[in-house]
Amino acid sequence: MSNTQKQLALAKAAKKSVNTADTEEKNRALLAMADSLEAATADILAANRQDLEAAAGNIPESMTDRLLLDGKRICAMADGIRAVAALPNPVGEILETSTLPNGLEIVKKRVAMGVIGIIYESRPNVTSDAAALALKSGSAVVLRSGKDAFQSARAIVAALKTGLAQTRIDPDALQLIEDTGRESSYEMMRAKDYLDLLIPRGGAGLIRAVVENAVVPVIETGTGIVHIYIDKDADWDKALRIVYNAKTSRPSVCNSMEVLLVHEDIAADFLPKLERLLVRDRIEAGLPPIRFRLDPQAARHIGGEAAGADDFDTEFLDYILAVKTVASVEEAVWHIETHSTHHSDGIVTENRHAADYFTTHIDSAAVYVNASTRFTDGGEFGLGCEMGISTQKLHARGPMGLKELTSYKYIVQGTGQVRE
């Protein structure tokens, strides 16, 4: 048995302590974990510095922001755990009841998933978010961090397990796979005897590898090739504010805009205003400017590189924006449906017909009208921190909160009935 299998077995053995814990026990554990996380701030920051030093020069500036921890972010992680503790316990919820003609009473009841595996890349906050959500939803959790964030993840998990040790929940219900080699990921993908669900969080390569190789049931948290279409009837003040926020607030996250579509009737006047906002104003403010990848029509109005064959199919996660002009809302929808990963896509318009057409025909987990796509987030949706953004349709879609991490069973109460 490999070390990874041993850790999977420990989580499976400990799952009953979580599966059967009541609301008070789970909340007590989460609050202890949050306190312990804050108490370990110095250790976590020291570990994070190791990760940052190892990554220096090897990852883009925008990705460094994902990896970076400071005291404020650790406090936010702890507060995120406390927010999960404050959410209703999904386990035990009665979903449906019915009584059959023969007198059998059937209850459909929400239950814990069991053991959830998470494979993720260089985002230390995922460690605490995933642990909190899994435990509150009644499941043990096995985490497999990317190598870039491993020292941070190890320090975070050590703190969380210290908190768990003060409660009735077995600390073994939280595991961080120590082996950062690729084989440990494949062991988790094949671990159907230990894992009830596997969730990948990361770039397209990781997600594709898990979806194509896993024998464990998977919820796909897809990449975010996120589009915003500026209609000819858009309010320009709204449009500029939305585009600025959707692209620049955190370009390294999956709900950040990657492709801007602009109606050709307004492109000649709108795009230069956008260029001023995203390039010259940011340079004057000492901020990284947005670098444009332009189709031939957009290139007539602003400066930038010519868009390559793959630029409208790329999740840049950087200060790069692909820009294209379109002749109608119908063409915008066609382009999005051709290139979208069905994560989050939006329209800016004051035309109700255009908005209705867009929301009807765009098949994404979140579809926006006159708002930034950056809101696709469990916290912003009122779900607490989320396990990821599901882009598939089965079991879960969009931000995955507590309910999306559970299953259900039927309880059938009889009085001696037998089937004829």
Curated annotation (Swiss-Prot):
<keyword id="KW-0521">NADP</keyword>
<comment type="function">
    <text>Catalyzes the NADPH-dependent reduction of L-glutamate 5-phosphate into L-glutamate 5-semialdehyde and phosphate. The product spontaneously undergoes cyclization to form 1-pyrroline-5-carboxylate.</text>
</comment>
<dbReference type="GO" id="GO:0005737">
    <property type="term" value="C:cytoplasm"/>
</dbReference>
<dbReference type="Pfam" id="PF00171">
    <property type="entry name" value="Aldedh"/>
</dbReference>
<keyword id="KW-0963">Cytoplasm</keyword>
<comment type="similarity">
    <text>Belongs to the gamma-glutamyl phosphate reductase family.</text>
</comment>
<dbReference type="GO" id="GO:0055129">
    <property type="term" value="P:L-proline biosynthetic process"/>
</dbReference>
<dbReference type="InterPro" id="IPR016163">
    <property type="entry name" value="Ald_DH_C"/>
</dbReference>
<keyword id="KW-0641">Proline biosynthesis</keyword>
<keyword id="KW-0028">Amino-acid biosynthesis</keyword>
<dbReference type="InterPro" id="IPR020593">
    <property type="entry name" value="G-glutamylP_reductase_CS"/>
</dbReference>
<keyword id="KW-0560">Oxidoreductase</keyword>
<protein>
    <recommendedName>
        <fullName>Gamma-glutamyl phosphate reductase</fullName>
        <ecNumber>1.2.1.41</ecNumber>
    </recommendedName>
</protein>
<dbReference type="GO" id="GO:0050661">
    <property type="term" value="F:NADP binding"/>
</dbReference>
<comment type="pathway">
    <text>Amino-acid biosynthesis; L-proline biosynthesis; L-glutamate 5-semialdehyde from L-glutamate: step 2/2.</text>
</comment>
<dbReference type="InterPro" id="IPR016161">
    <property type="entry name" value="Ald_DH/histidinol_DH"/>
</dbReference>
<dbReference type="InterPro" id="IPR000965">
    <property type="entry name" value="GPR_dom"/>
</dbReference>
<dbReference type="InterPro" id="IPR015590">
    <property type="entry name" value="Aldehyde_DH_dom"/>
</dbReference>
<dbReference type="InterPro" id="IPR012134">
    <property type="entry name" value="Glu-5-SA_DH"/>
</dbReference>
<dbReference type="GO" id="GO:0004350">
    <property type="term" value="F:glutamate-5-semialdehyde dehydrogenase activity"/>
</dbReference>
<dbReference type="InterPro" id="IPR016162">
    <property type="entry name" value="Ald_DH_N"/>
</dbReference>
